[in-house]
Amino acid sequence: PGWKMPADIRLQLRDNTLILSDNGGRSLYFEHLFPGEDGYSRSESLWLVRGGMAKLDEGHRLAALWQALPEELHLSPHRYLATNSPQGPWWVLGWCERVPEADEVLPAPLPPYRVLTGLVDRFGRTQTFHREAAGEFSGEITGVTDGAGRHFRLVLTTQAQRAEEARQQAISGGTEPSAFPDTLPGYTEYGRDNGIRLSAVWLTHDPEYPDNLPAAPLVRYGWTPRGELAAVYDRSNTQVRSFTYDDKYRGRMVAHRHTGRPEIRYRYDSDGRVTEQLNPAGLSYTYQYEKDRITITDSLDRREVLHTAGEGGLKRVVKKEHADGSVTQSQFDAVGRLKAQTDAAGRTTEYSPDVVTGLITRITTPDGRASAFYYNHHSQLTSATGTDGLEIRREYDES
């Protein structure tokens, strides 16, 4: 019902296992790593590397990216770094400082987990997340410093603070206060919910224009009494997005609107799947779900059928029946990468991905002719040979 940042990840350190989780509910398991060792998830194409090494082996795909890290990061065995590409960025997993208890023995041991403390791109530019050390927002990100030295303050609010603000606004406006509870359920189907939400983002320091900082937040967020994102306002305090939710199911969005555009509405089945997408100014769609099959019909009565195979994150569309009656089919390998596609005329094109990177190294057309692709350690295309035998080459500078 709240909001999430795709890169907001957390690492649990157990005796023989490392568990990398995001706040979308995904968890990846890695074996224990020694300093400088790495683990790789083929299903997610993601590396996890433990610090404590000045350089990685020269032939390692992440060797160049590793050198982009500040020395204090790649030399620290207590930090872990994750990336899904040899071109970066690195997600830096460390720990946030906290205020020790009065009777606590110091120095306190490091916690058995790591949280996101920053990002580093392949040019060495950093983005640092500052977390509160104490108080009601302890451990939460309340500040960000970017690579240009600009500092942004993230204003967080609790459910009780938003409830009090709603009551004060009602009193000052001479209206009856609406029902706005002081607390939210501590646990929902989306996971634990402490009721803390991002309410505004301010630019508080800009080294280029230190005396010309904006007098208003860059963006502001409004929330429903149930903690759902209700509206987004830009720096001129103009509402640019709005959201509506199901009365019965907390967090289930039933409508959204961009300012100046029509409202898009959604209907759901008893399993929480979208059955209708209604657009008053364009095409609307209905969705019918069966086992390994989804039927999509638009408001012009055109129908497509998607046939799926696999489970969870490896579920893929293996066959598509188009509105014109034609059928296309796709094949995937064990980790969900495309291997072949067959068009409506029965012609098959084959794809050969690299075992480690997933990058396409060869495409074979239905008539047996092949194209080949070659990459550098940054996963950048360096040369390609077409079916006609012609070759193209690309060169890149050091940056």
Regions found by a protein language model. Give the residues of each.
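Extended charged/polar low-complexity repeat regions
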Residues: 1-7, 11-399
